[in-house]
Amino acid sequence: MAETIQEVEDEYKAFCKSFSKESDDPVACIHFTAEGEVTFKSILFVPTFVPRGLFDEYGSKKSDYIKLYVRCVFITDDFRDTMPKNLNFVKGVVDSGGLSLNVSCETLQQHKLLKVIRKKLVHKTLDMIKKIADEKYNDTFWKEFGTNIKLGVIEDHSNRTCLAKLLRFQSSHHPADITSLHQDVERMKEKQDKICLMAGGYEVIYLTEPVVEYCIQALPEFDGKRFQNVAKEGVKFDDSEKTKESHEAVEKEFEPLPNWVKDKAIKDKIEKAMVSQCLTESLCALVASQYGWSGNMERIMKAQAYQTGKGISTNYHASRKKTFEINPRHPLIRDMLRRIKEDEDDKTVLDLAVVEEPDEEPEETAEDKEQDKDKEMDVGTDEEKQETAKESTAEKDEL
């Protein structure tokens, strides 16, 4: 009697658990026959958990999770290139009739048919991962193997577009959940042509993990949309003539303040000062230049515990000063503009503009400091600021 689909799936699960010596069902499994230049059969599967020591000596350690058979005779599992480094968690067997039983392992490593097998294994593996149900993918696969996908985007140029579709991020749309780049693009506002990384009512993707910023730097665009890191200068959400004219008018109105900040208040600590187009609630922000390190990247580089020395590139990026952006809609900024027009040497304004090193006592947050300055300068309540932020967002939506 013909087996049911469920019975076949149960047999595959039993095989995978026996093969990997694990008690949990695999996250995904695929059984296929490849034909063409070389014919072979294969069963591949994704384990439930990251194999122990997966990232020990990453890239230099051979993977023994793929076992090669020739006409049902075991040949070897001593491979370095059966699967790319980022897919070294995939387990399974390959049985080919197109290889010789007498071939040595050394010769096999250079065999041209092995390269064909590898290419097809990668294609089938990515196809298998893409078909994992969203809930299982987000809750199980991404938590265990998300780092592998990000490393793949960095290292595997030929499959980068496919791997980008498998990336997941936290975003401002639903902070408790994770989202794909495809979902982010679908939710884009009209006229938005860039994916925001880090807001004026725009969904922002959070780069919270060390590897993920390298990953995005290796990915020029997704679905025709380039990435825009809002922790860097030059963020624009709308390039329409109406928006340009509006911003130019604001820049002209506030011109004395950025000039005063750059030339007098904190001239030795910043590269330049400018009027922001994206701040809505914060009164100001320090952002990196287009080719500089973001604050997150700086923390990553400073945390390199085994760094043996700094190269020319590292020293160059580490020494670059930040750009100081001000929010022209914030009551405190408006009051600063009024005060410096009256007296450029106003002690209160000078004190407010000083950029200090990070506090040794983190209990006093930036928000606490801002509230203290509000009281000192007798500027806007929280309700007034919120109303200003709402008006700012409404203005952008209209544009």
Curated annotation (Swiss-Prot):
Say which family it is in: Belongs to the heat shock protein 90 family.
Q: Where is the composition biased (Basic and acidic residues)?
A: 368-399
Q: Tell me which UniProt keywords the record has, alphabetically.
A: Chaperone, Isopeptide bond, Stress response, Ubl conjugation
Per the entry, what this protein does is: Putative molecular chaperone.
Q: Supply the name of the protein.
A: Putative endoplasmin-like protein
* GO CC annotations, alphabetized: mitochondrial inner membrane
Q: Which InterPro entries match?
A: HSP90_C (IPR037196), Hsp90_fam (IPR001404), Ribosomal_Su5_D2-typ_SF (IPR020568)
Gene Ontology MF, one: protein kinase binding
| GO process annotations (BP) | protein folding
Bias-annotated ranges (Acidic residues): 354-367
Q: Which gene encodes it?
A: HSP90B2P
Q: Where is this cross-link: Glycyl lysine isopeptide (Lys-Gly) (interchain with G-Cter in SUMO2)?
A: K130
Query: Which segments carry the region annotation Disordered?
Result: 350-399
Top-level taxonomic group? Eukaryota
Q: Does the keyword Chaperone apply?
A: yes
